[in-house]
């Protein structure tokens, strides 16, 4: 709450005192609930010093303090208006009584609003001392108020008057807090410190609650809400895990090749199961692993070659599969584009036809007022269909359904009137041939565009089909080449094996011939006695027998060579 003090007259009337101002303020503004609970203006005013009174807790209320209008400076004899003359008797006996005005307050917290005054009032100590207000800035609490209360109001009035007259700039304002106000007015708080945020006591007369207590409650509620939000924040951060959906595999997609060990496992699993039918999968896998480790590199290479060939075939099939997917996607996108273009053309034609229909009907008006005289059952019996327009826009077709129970004398004039309106509209369409030609041109352009789009789509489809055929041909050629290579490799291996077998046979024959020659040489080197005895005949007789196998062996060699030649010839014919 901002309390404003207005300047008094320059002459400082003697009749103005602190009690009069408080009496006027309590009587006029607060009624029964007085601001300072002052007594009435009579001789019992000083009895208030012996009584205790409570200051109400001022909430957000706003009080209007009327300005104190001073008399003009030209008339010094008039110190105060006539309305304040009866109260001058209260200020006269103050010095004669000798009693001190010591208001007492119960030990309670006060929620008094700050009063805004000029800042230079606090800084200029000389002005305050000259006006009679003695301020001790070192002490913030004063026990008793020992001066004349009239001097306080006079000093305050002089301070505001000095601010208005230009001694102090009015723009510099400061705020006096509660402790400074209590120190200046001499409020004896009984040793209780004034707290700005303490709630009002329950004995306070004001019905409104203290704003400080409500602020504290709101702060507590906000703190509790913040704690609750912090507790619920980690719970809300945890989101349930959504199960990942497995993608459905396309049955047309080629399968990935199997490793060499998997091929070996397939080959050996059946044999192991046959030998050990009660063996588990783990035992079988252990046996297969040991067998795989015991295999040589050549046998492993056989399975590795098979896997490499399967990988090559898989890559080729995968390329073909992806090409087919691309072609399908392109075809679907082309179909979607054609559908969209057709829909757009249809929508544009519908819009143009509806616009032309509306313009023709607005130019020639609606059905004349003669059908309005028909009875209420007429709209139910006659239901005109909407006007249908064709593309050339040369004629407008209308159809009217007439109920069986409708009298003929009512239907005839209605049909005749509608016919006249339709004829008028037809003539109007004939009158504007330029519009028809423009529409016809637009339709022709749209048809041409559609035809071009269709042709482009067909060309794209043909190109895609050709690409697909080319890919298939390439795949077939590659497969045929691969098959031929495998066949050639097999034939080469067979030819090599045959050559090796022939070489082995030739080596065996050569060894056999060498042995025979050695034996023959040994027999010739032995000395034979020249005796015509049966022993010599027996000894000499085996020589031709031993030498006789030579022509047989010579005959056997050409037979073997002829056989090898016959085996090589069919192989050459295959190549």
Curated annotation (Swiss-Prot):
Residues 189-258, 516-575 are annotated as: Disordered. GO terms for biological process: apoptotic process; negative regulation of neuron apoptotic process; positive regulation of transcription by RNA polymerase II; regulation of apoptotic process. Residues 527-541 have a biased composition (Polar residues). Homodimer. Interacts (via HGM box) with CITED1 (via C-terminus); the interaction increases estrogen-response element (ERE)-dependent transcription and protection against cell death. Interacts with CREB1 (phosphorylated form). Interacts with CREB1; the interaction is not depolarization dependent. Interacts with CREBBP (via C-terminus). It comes from Mus musculus. Residues 239-249 have a biased composition (Basic residues). This is TOX high mobility group box family member 3. Transcriptional coactivator of the p300/CBP-mediated transcription complex. Activates transactivation through cAMP response element (CRE) sites. Protects against cell death by inducing antiapoptotic and repressing pro-apoptotic transcripts. Stimulates transcription from the estrogen-responsive or BCL-2 promoters. Required for depolarization-induced transcription activation of the C-FOS promoter in neurons. Associates with chromatin to the estrogen-responsive C3 promoter region. The C-terminus is required for calcium responsiveness but not for transactivation activity. The N-terminus is absolutely necessary for transactivation activity. PROSITE patterns: HMG_BOX_2. Residues 222-238 have a biased composition (Basic and acidic residues). It is found in: Nucleus. Residues 195-214, 516-526, 548-575 have a biased composition (Low complexity). One of its GO terms (cellular component) is nucleoplasm. Keywords: Activator, Apoptosis, DNA-binding, Nucleus, Transcription, Transcription regulation. GO terms for molecular function: chromatin binding; DNA binding; phosphoprotein binding; protein homodimerization activity; transcription coactivator activity. Residues 254-322 bind DNA.
